[in-house]
Amino acid sequence: MLRISARFYCKIATQSSFKAAEYKNKIKKDKKLNFTQLLHPTKVPQTPVPAAFSDPSENVVEIDTKTIQLLERLSLVDLDSDQALATLKSSIQFADKIAHIDTQNVRPLYTVLEKQQLQLRNDQVTAGDSRAELLRCAKVTDEDYYVSPPGNIPLEQ
């Protein structure tokens, strides 16, 4: 039997006589979290945060043909068109902007499922020999392995 306990990953604004056990019992009864009790109910800033980005036209990305060929081989994507190269260059510029954002004084985020209790199913013991049943789910198999298409290239029928 698994023991499920509620863990709190954020501070709750309460009086000093607050007891965690009382709050856990209250949460179990209510089944809903009262966001007004949290010191920081959201991690989304209430006001815009100024950020200094350089002009994208200043950072012109030049990619040599050897790098383009390597990317085509690794990603199985054709980069011969001008539109594909423009998309690749803008993606690199965007990643460069993100890499230069100052995150020195930014605290890590809480978990997405901060106060939600996840329902767990009961464990069921099986014989464990269900290989044939699992392989029947796949469209294409080879010996005892799944066969998947390599990237965006379809398998021959």
Curated annotation (Swiss-Prot):
Catalytic activity, reaction form: L-glutamyl-tRNA(Gln) + L-glutamine + ATP + H2O = L-glutaminyl-tRNA(Gln) + L-glutamate + ADP + phosphate + H(+)
Superkingdom of origin organism: Eukaryota
One GO BP: mitochondrial translation
A GO cellular component annotation in the UniProt record: glutamyl-tRNA(Gln) amidotransferase complex
Subcellular location: Mitochondrion
A Pfam family: GatC
Stated family: Belongs to the GatC family.
GO terms of molecular function: ATP binding; glutaminyl-tRNA synthase (glutamine-hydrolyzing) activity
Alphabetical UniProt keywords: ATP-binding, Ligase, Mitochondrion, Nucleotide-binding, Protein biosynthesis
Function: Allows the formation of correctly charged Gln-tRNA(Gln) through the transamidation of misacylated Glu-tRNA(Gln) in the mitochondria. The reaction takes place in the presence of glutamine and ATP through an activated gamma-phospho-Glu-tRNA(Gln).
NCBIfam families: gatC
Note in the entry: This protein may be expected to contain an N-terminal transit peptide but none has been predicted.
EC numbers for this chain: 6.3.5.-
Protein name as it appears in the record: Glutamyl-tRNA(Gln) amidotransferase subunit C, mitochondrial
UniProt cross-references to InterPro entries, sorted A to Z: Asp/Glu-ADT_sf_sub_c (IPR036113), GatC (IPR003837)
